[in-house]
Amino acid sequence: VKTSQTGYIQRRLVKGLEDLKVEYDMTVRNNKNKIIQYSYGDDGIDPIRVESQILPLVNMSVEEIYTHYQMPSDNMKDDVFTTSYTKPTLKRLKKQITDTNKRCKEIIDMMIEYRDTIIKYVFKMRDNKKVNIPVAFQQIINNVRGQQYINVNSMVDITPLEALELIDDGYKRIESFHYVKPTELFKIMYYYYLTPKNLLMVKRFNRNAVEILIEK
C-alpha cells in the first residue's frame, strides 16, 4: 500500500539516484563527489579474500631465498641440471649464463627487501604466512602443467633467461592496467611462484606452457 510516507521515501531515492554518476576511474559518486560504490556494477564482495594462500617467503632465510631463485649454472656438466633441456636450448643457455645470474641476483635482492617489508607491515611481526589475493598461483601452475600433459620426463625448450623475460613482460602488462594496477603483495606472490628454477627444473615447463601460464 502506497502511503504518503512511502511516496516520500520513493521520491528521495529517485532524487538521490539522479545525482549519481560514474566517473572515469569507474567509481560511482554523488553530487558532492563522495564515493558511493568503488566499482560500477560491483557485487560488494571483496575479491581480495577469495583465495587464501601460503607465502613461504616470510619464513625463509637469505640462504633459502638464494636457493629458491638462483639457477645452478656454475656447473654446466651437472647431468641433473642439463638433461632436462633440449640441445639447442642448452647451447643458448651457456651463452646466457652471465645475464641469467645478473637478473636472478636482482630478483633475489628485491625479494629479500620485500620479505622484511611484509613481515613488518603486512604480518606486523606475527608468526603467519597466509595471504589473501584473488589469484591462486599454485593451482594455475598445476592446471597448465596438466593441460599440456607435462611430466617429469618432458623436455624444456626455453632457457631460464628467456623464461624470466616472459615473466617480466607478463608483469609489465598487468602493471599497465589503468584501473586495476597490481598491489605490492601481488607482485611478491607473482615473482615467488613464477621462478624459472621451479617452472623449468621442477615442473618441466616448455616455452608454450610458460606463455600460456603468463596469459592466464
What are these regions (language model features)?
Residues 1-66, 196-216:
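Long insertion/accessory domains within large nucleic-acid-processing enzymes
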Residues 1, 55, 59-216:
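Core mixed alpha/beta domains of very large multi-subunit molecular machines
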